[in-house]
């Protein structure tokens, strides 16, 4: 096979709607171009610098066909590795290389991986409101669209900030009360089950807002409402506590969106301390490690629910679909509808049909970027308020 030489690499940051989105574009001597998602929206320009200043000089002139070798070279070339900036940069290139390989083979990625395990992957979306009535409206809107798995949040991630017992002059931040959050969320589960019964599966994201002892209490109390899963009940640094939760509650646990390093998930999977791994594909380094993670999890009965928030390009979301269609232990896929300008920049973006995401049949990833449209929406950086999370006394806490 003749080599496919990398002739240029671009890294484009665009903000068509609320979020800064990072896309890597790899050009080759065969006039085949690949696209990848490298979005780390809190630090987009750091990722761009990594691609432009370090990965591009390393890769120009090399054969794009050798994805495995190039992935390892990109990962170890800086010596220090497995952080969010380098992983996202590597992932953007890695996805683009897989996109090129699929286009050269005239195959969609899931065929290149080995074919499909299912007809479609069930999707879930987010219903959130500050009031129960508002939450009911959101639930019914999503149910009417065909969703039978709905993530429900009352007061988003922390209850009612207006009801906090605050200090005299609170430091700036996004405040929440853990006890109030637990009480409100358990009341939400009870109300949803009383109103809707088992018409749909309820998912919920704790977003690592609890102390370990509170997480144990919450997992025990919420079990009676049969959630599909409870997400990120603890921050990664406290995951040793998952064994305590596991021994006292049968509630399904999901975690992984903050993981960057294989050491963060290996013991959790081997010891079966979680039911679902939901890593963010670009945060772990792209398609190449995601395929290996999927196979590793299958050996231990752990299922996959890839992270797919709004601050992610439709290219990255399409990669998730290909992984889900192929990997036997894929369970469900998070999805949030794209705003209008995002669809202009990514015109091939895929949406669910009646609660399912179906295989993409175009060669490669099957979703690209309109570069002219993207350049109409330059990067706009702002400090992120929601990641400045504080307890009522002003103490910083994991967001």
UniProtKB/Swiss-Prot annotation:
GO biological process, one term: amino acid catabolic process
Binding-site residues, Mg(2+): 205, 231, 257
GO molecular function terms noted in the UniProt entry: magnesium ion binding
Entry keyword Metal-binding: yes
Pfam families with a match to the protein in the record: MR_MLE_C, MR_MLE_N
Cystine pairings recorded for this chain: none
Membership in a protein family: Belongs to the mandelate racemase/muconate lactonizing enzyme family. GalD subfamily.
Role of this protein: Has no detectable activity with D-mannonate and with a panel of 70 other acid sugars (in vitro), in spite of the conservation of the residues that are expected to be important for catalytic activity and cofactor binding. May have evolved a divergent function.
This protein's name: D-galactonate dehydratase family member ECA0189
Top-level taxonomy: Bacteria, Pseudomonadati, Pseudomonadota, Gammaproteobacteria, Enterobacterales
């Amino acid at each position: 096979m003749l080599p496919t030489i990398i002739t240029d690499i671009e890294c484009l940051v665009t903000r068509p709607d609320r979020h800064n989105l990072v896309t890597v574009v790899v050009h080759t001597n065969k006039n085949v171009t690949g696209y990848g998602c490298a979005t780390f929206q809190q630090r987009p320009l750091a990722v761009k610098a990594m691609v432009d200043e370090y990965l591009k000089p390393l890769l120009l002139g090399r054969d794009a066909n050798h994805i495995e070798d190039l992935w390892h070279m990109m990962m170890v070339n800086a010596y220090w590795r497995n952080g969010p900036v380098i992983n996202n940069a590597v992932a953007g290139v890695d996805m683009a290389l897989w996109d090129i390989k699929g286009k050269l083979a005239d195959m969609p990625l899931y065929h290149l991986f080995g074919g499909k395990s299912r007809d479609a992957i069930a999707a879930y979306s987010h219903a959130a409101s500050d009031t129960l009535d508002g939450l009911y409206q959101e639930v019914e809107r999503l149910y009417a669209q065909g969703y039978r798995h709905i993530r429900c949040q009352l007061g988003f991630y922390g209850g009612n900030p207006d009801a906090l017992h605050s200090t005299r002059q609170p430091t700036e931040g996004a405040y929440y009360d853990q006890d109030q959050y637990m009480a409100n969320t358990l009341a939400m589960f009870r109300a949803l089950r009383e109103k809707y019964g088992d018409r749909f599966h309820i998912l919920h994201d704790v977003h690592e807002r609890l102390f370990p002892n509170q997480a144990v209490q919450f997992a025990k109390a919420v079990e009676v409402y049969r959630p599909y899963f409870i997400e990120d009940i603890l921050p990664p640094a406290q995951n040793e506590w998952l064994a305590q939760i596991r021994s006292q509650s049968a509630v399904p646990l999901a975690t992984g969106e903050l993981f960057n390093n294989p050491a963060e998930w290996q013991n959790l999977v081997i010891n079966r301390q979680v039911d679902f791994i939901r890593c963010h594909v670009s945060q772990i380094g792209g398609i190449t490690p995601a395929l290996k993670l999927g196979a590793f999890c299958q050996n231990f009965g752990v299922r996959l629910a890839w992270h797919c928030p709004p601050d992610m390009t439709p290219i990255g979301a399409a990669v998730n679909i290909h992984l889900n269609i192929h990997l036997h232990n894929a369970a469900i896929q998070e999805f949030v509808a794209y705003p209008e300008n995002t669809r202009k920049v990514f015109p091939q973006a895929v949406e669910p049909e009646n609660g399912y995401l179906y295989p993409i049949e175009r060669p490669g990833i099957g979703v690209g970027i309109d570069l002219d449209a993207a350049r109409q929406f330059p990067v706009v950086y702002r400090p992120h308020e929601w990641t400045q999370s504080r307890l009522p006394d002003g103490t910083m806490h994991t967001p």
